[in-house]
Amino acid sequence: MLSNSLMSNLSMWTPQLPALLAAFRVLRYDTRGHGESEVTAAPYSIAQLADDAAALITFTGVGAVHFAGLSMGGMIGQQLAIRHPDKVLSLSLCDTASEMPTPAMWNDRLSTAREKGIAGLVDGTIKRWFVPDFVANSADTINEVRRMILTTPLDGYIGCASAVRDMSQTHLLKQIKAPTQVIVGREDPACTLAQSQVLENEIPGAVLHVIDDAAHLANIEKPAQFTQLLFDFISTQAASLASAGKPHQ
Protein backbone atom coordinates (compact mmCIF):
# COMPACT_ATOMS: atom_id res chain seq x y z
CA MET A 1 0.00 0.00 0.00
CA LEU A 2 1.52 3.29 -1.14
CA SER A 3 0.64 6.61 0.50
CA ASN A 4 1.40 9.95 -1.16
CA SER A 5 3.02 13.15 0.07
CA LEU A 6 1.35 16.50 0.60
CA MET A 7 0.52 18.24 -2.71
CA SER A 8 0.84 15.06 -4.75
CA ASN A 9 -1.36 12.12 -5.66
CA LEU A 10 -1.03 8.41 -6.29
CA SER A 11 0.81 9.07 -9.57
CA MET A 12 3.94 9.99 -7.60
CA TRP A 13 4.56 6.25 -7.17
CA THR A 14 4.64 5.50 -10.90
CA PRO A 15 8.45 4.91 -10.95
CA GLN A 16 8.04 2.10 -8.42
CA LEU A 17 5.16 0.27 -10.09
CA PRO A 18 6.89 -2.00 -12.64
CA ALA A 19 9.12 -3.67 -10.07
CA LEU A 20 6.48 -3.92 -7.37
CA LEU A 21 3.75 -5.22 -9.67
CA ALA A 22 6.07 -7.98 -10.85
CA ALA A 23 5.90 -9.55 -7.39
CA PHE A 24 3.05 -8.02 -5.39
CA ARG A 25 -0.47 -6.72 -5.53
CA VAL A 26 -0.15 -2.94 -5.20
CA LEU A 27 -2.70 -0.55 -3.73
CA ARG A 28 -2.13 3.15 -4.37
CA TYR A 29 -4.57 5.71 -3.07
CA ASP A 30 -5.06 9.47 -2.90
CA THR A 31 -5.04 10.82 0.64
CA ARG A 32 -8.13 12.74 1.75
CA GLY A 33 -8.21 16.14 0.03
CA HIS A 34 -5.84 15.06 -2.74
CA GLY A 35 -6.18 13.59 -6.22
CA GLU A 36 -9.57 12.01 -6.73
CA SER A 37 -10.35 11.54 -3.03
CA GLU A 38 -12.99 13.63 -1.31
CA VAL A 39 -12.15 17.08 -0.01
CA THR A 40 -13.75 17.50 3.40
CA ALA A 41 -13.75 20.48 5.73
CA ALA A 42 -10.36 21.37 7.22
CA PRO A 43 -8.48 20.87 9.43
CA TYR A 44 -7.56 17.19 9.36
CA SER A 45 -5.34 15.20 11.71
CA ILE A 46 -2.74 12.54 11.01
CA ALA A 47 -4.75 10.12 13.15
CA GLN A 48 -7.81 10.80 10.98
CA LEU A 49 -5.80 10.18 7.82
CA ALA A 50 -4.47 6.94 9.31
CA ASP A 51 -8.02 5.85 10.07
CA ASP A 52 -8.86 6.58 6.42
CA ALA A 53 -6.08 4.22 5.35
CA ALA A 54 -7.29 1.57 7.79
CA ALA A 55 -10.82 1.86 6.42
CA LEU A 56 -9.50 1.41 2.88
CA ILE A 57 -7.58 -1.71 3.91
CA THR A 58 -10.75 -3.09 5.48
CA PHE A 59 -12.78 -2.23 2.38
CA THR A 60 -10.39 -4.05 0.04
CA GLY A 61 -10.52 -7.16 2.19
CA VAL A 62 -6.77 -7.81 2.09
CA GLY A 63 -6.50 -7.93 5.87
CA ALA A 64 -3.08 -6.36 6.27
CA VAL A 65 -0.52 -4.64 4.06
CA HIS A 66 3.12 -3.79 3.64
CA PHE A 67 2.74 -0.02 3.98
CA ALA A 68 5.06 2.52 2.35
CA GLY A 69 4.49 6.25 2.76
CA LEU A 70 6.53 9.26 1.73
CA SER A 71 6.53 12.50 3.72
CA MET A 72 2.91 12.93 4.86
CA GLY A 73 2.35 9.33 3.78
CA GLY A 74 5.05 8.21 6.20
CA MET A 75 3.47 10.23 8.99
CA ILE A 76 0.21 8.45 8.25
CA GLY A 77 2.05 5.12 8.27
CA GLN A 78 3.37 5.74 11.78
CA GLN A 79 -0.12 6.38 13.10
CA LEU A 80 -1.54 3.45 11.16
CA ALA A 81 0.98 1.09 12.75
CA ILE A 82 0.18 2.51 16.20
CA ARG A 83 -3.61 2.73 15.90
CA HIS A 84 -4.21 -0.33 13.72
CA PRO A 85 -1.23 -2.67 14.23
CA ASP A 86 -3.17 -5.66 12.90
CA LYS A 87 -3.34 -4.00 9.47
CA VAL A 88 0.42 -3.44 9.03
CA LEU A 89 2.76 -6.27 8.02
CA SER A 90 5.75 -3.99 7.52
CA LEU A 91 6.42 -0.27 7.38
CA SER A 92 8.58 1.74 4.98
CA LEU A 93 8.85 5.34 6.17
CA CYS A 94 10.31 7.50 3.42
CA ASP A 95 11.53 11.10 3.67
CA THR A 96 9.29 11.66 6.66
CA ALA A 97 9.27 12.71 10.30
CA SER A 98 7.43 12.16 13.56
CA GLU A 99 6.95 15.86 14.24
CA MET A 100 7.78 19.19 12.64
CA PRO A 101 10.04 21.71 14.40
CA THR A 102 7.82 24.80 14.42
CA PRO A 103 4.27 25.71 13.40
CA ALA A 104 5.33 29.16 12.17
CA MET A 105 6.65 27.86 8.84
CA TRP A 106 3.43 25.97 8.18
CA ASN A 107 1.31 28.94 9.17
CA ASP A 108 3.22 31.02 6.61
CA ARG A 109 2.58 28.42 3.91
CA LEU A 110 -1.09 28.24 4.81
CA SER A 111 -1.33 32.02 4.59
CA THR A 112 0.34 31.97 1.17
CA ALA A 113 -2.06 29.27 -0.02
CA ARG A 114 -5.08 31.25 1.13
CA GLU A 115 -3.80 34.45 -0.49
CA LYS A 116 -2.30 33.13 -3.73
CA GLY A 117 -3.67 29.63 -4.12
CA ILE A 118 -1.58 26.51 -4.67
CA ALA A 119 0.30 28.33 -7.46
CA GLY A 120 1.95 30.47 -4.80
CA LEU A 121 3.59 27.40 -3.29
CA VAL A 122 4.88 25.65 -6.39
CA ASP A 123 8.37 27.14 -6.80
CA GLY A 124 9.31 26.74 -3.15
CA THR A 125 8.01 23.20 -3.15
CA ILE A 126 10.08 22.22 -6.19
CA LYS A 127 13.21 23.62 -4.49
CA ARG A 128 12.57 21.52 -1.39
CA TRP A 129 11.64 18.36 -3.22
CA PHE A 130 14.64 18.06 -5.55
CA VAL A 131 18.36 18.80 -5.58
CA PRO A 132 19.38 21.61 -7.98
CA ASP A 133 21.08 19.30 -10.49
CA PHE A 134 17.92 17.23 -10.85
CA VAL A 135 15.82 20.33 -11.43
CA ALA A 136 18.28 21.57 -14.05
CA ASN A 137 18.57 18.28 -15.92
CA SER A 138 15.09 16.75 -15.65
CA ALA A 139 12.80 19.35 -17.18
CA ASP A 140 10.11 16.90 -18.29
CA THR A 141 9.84 15.32 -14.86
CA ILE A 142 9.82 18.68 -13.11
CA ASN A 143 7.04 19.89 -15.39
CA GLU A 144 5.00 16.77 -14.60
CA VAL A 145 5.52 17.31 -10.89
CA ARG A 146 4.60 20.96 -11.22
CA ARG A 147 1.33 19.98 -12.89
CA MET A 148 0.66 17.44 -10.17
CA ILE A 149 1.16 20.03 -7.44
CA LEU A 150 -1.18 22.46 -9.18
CA THR A 151 -4.00 19.88 -9.21
CA THR A 152 -4.07 19.85 -5.40
CA PRO A 153 -7.38 21.24 -4.13
CA LEU A 154 -6.80 24.29 -1.93
CA ASP A 155 -9.03 23.03 0.88
CA GLY A 156 -7.38 19.63 0.72
CA TYR A 157 -3.97 21.24 1.06
CA ILE A 158 -5.12 23.34 4.00
CA GLY A 159 -6.58 20.29 5.73
CA CYS A 160 -3.51 18.10 5.27
CA ALA A 161 -0.96 20.85 5.90
CA SER A 162 -2.72 21.58 9.18
CA ALA A 163 -2.41 17.90 10.08
CA VAL A 164 1.32 17.91 9.36
CA ARG A 165 1.79 21.16 11.29
CA ASP A 166 0.01 19.83 14.37
CA MET A 167 1.54 16.35 14.33
CA SER A 168 3.41 15.24 17.45
CA GLN A 169 4.06 11.51 17.60
CA THR A 170 7.69 10.97 18.57
CA HIS A 171 6.57 9.86 22.03
CA LEU A 172 4.44 7.14 20.43
CA LEU A 173 7.07 5.57 18.16
CA LYS A 174 8.14 2.85 20.58
CA GLN A 175 4.63 1.41 20.26
CA ILE A 176 5.32 0.43 16.64
CA LYS A 177 5.76 -3.33 16.40
CA ALA A 178 5.86 -3.78 12.62
CA PRO A 179 9.27 -4.36 10.98
CA THR A 180 10.32 -0.90 9.82
CA GLN A 181 12.79 0.60 7.39
CA VAL A 182 13.44 4.33 7.08
CA ILE A 183 14.57 5.79 3.75
CA VAL A 184 15.76 9.39 3.36
CA GLY A 185 17.48 11.52 0.76
CA ARG A 186 20.66 12.87 2.28
CA GLU A 187 19.87 16.39 1.02
CA ASP A 188 16.23 16.43 2.15
CA PRO A 189 15.53 19.87 3.70
CA ALA A 190 11.85 19.14 4.42
CA CYS A 191 12.18 15.95 6.47
CA THR A 192 15.84 15.85 7.30
CA LEU A 193 18.31 13.06 7.91
CA ALA A 194 18.26 14.04 11.59
CA GLN A 195 14.50 13.54 11.67
CA SER A 196 14.90 10.13 10.04
CA GLN A 197 17.48 9.24 12.68
CA VAL A 198 14.85 9.95 15.32
CA LEU A 199 12.63 7.37 13.64
CA GLU A 200 15.50 4.90 13.46
CA ASN A 201 16.34 5.37 17.15
CA GLU A 202 12.79 5.38 18.52
CA ILE A 203 11.11 2.62 16.50
CA PRO A 204 12.24 -0.78 17.81
CA GLY A 205 14.44 -2.56 15.28
CA ALA A 206 14.13 0.12 12.59
CA VAL A 207 16.81 0.23 9.88
CA LEU A 208 17.87 3.47 8.15
CA HIS A 209 18.93 3.80 4.50
CA VAL A 210 20.32 7.10 3.19
CA ILE A 211 20.19 7.90 -0.54
CA ASP A 212 22.93 10.25 -1.70
CA ASP A 213 22.28 13.14 -4.09
CA ALA A 214 18.56 13.13 -3.35
CA ALA A 215 16.27 15.49 -1.49
CA HIS A 216 12.61 15.07 -0.48
CA LEU A 217 11.12 13.01 -3.31
CA ALA A 218 13.90 10.45 -3.40
CA ASN A 219 11.61 7.96 -5.12
CA ILE A 220 11.54 10.22 -8.18
CA GLU A 221 15.12 11.52 -8.06
CA LYS A 222 16.73 8.11 -7.51
CA PRO A 223 14.02 5.67 -8.62
CA ALA A 224 16.24 2.63 -9.14
CA GLN A 225 17.93 2.81 -5.74
CA PHE A 226 14.74 3.73 -3.91
CA THR A 227 12.71 0.98 -5.58
CA GLN A 228 15.36 -1.63 -4.86
CA LEU A 229 15.33 -0.73 -1.16
CA LEU A 230 11.55 -0.94 -1.09
CA PHE A 231 11.39 -4.18 -3.07
CA ASP A 232 14.10 -5.94 -1.07
CA PHE A 233 12.60 -4.98 2.28
CA ILE A 234 9.06 -6.03 1.39
CA SER A 235 10.34 -9.26 -0.17
CA THR A 236 12.30 -10.10 2.96
CA GLN A 237 9.35 -9.41 5.22
CA ALA A 238 6.96 -11.36 2.99
CA ALA A 239 9.32 -14.34 2.95
CA SER A 240 9.61 -14.23 6.73
CA LEU A 241 5.83 -14.21 7.09
CA ALA A 242 5.46 -17.04 4.58
CA SER A 243 7.97 -19.20 6.43
CA ALA A 244 5.99 -18.61 9.60
CA GLY A 245 2.78 -19.60 7.84
CA LYS A 246 1.26 -16.13 8.10
CA PRO A 247 -0.50 -14.05 5.41
CA HIS A 248 1.91 -11.84 3.47
CA GLN A 249 -0.16 -9.74 1.03
Please give the residue ranges for each predicted region.
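Flexible "cap/lid" loop of the alpha/beta hydrolase fold
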Residues: M75-R83, K87-V122
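Residue in the alpha/beta-hydrolase core beta-strand immediately N-terminal to the catalytic nucleophile
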Residues: D30, H66, L89-S92
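Catalytic active-site module of serine/aspartate enzymes centered on a nucleophile-bearing elbow/loop
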Residues: A206-Q249
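Acidic catalytic loop of the alpha/beta-hydrolase fold
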Residues: R186-C191
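Conserved alpha/beta-hydrolase catalytic His-Asp/Glu region
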Residues: P101-A104, E115-Q175
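Conserved HGGG/HGGXW glycine-rich cap/lid loop of the alpha/beta-hydrolase fold
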Residues: M1-A42
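Short beta-strand/loop motif that positions the catalytic acidic residue
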Residues: I176, V182-V184
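Conserved acidic catalytic loop of the alpha/beta-hydrolase fold
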Residues: Q48-V65
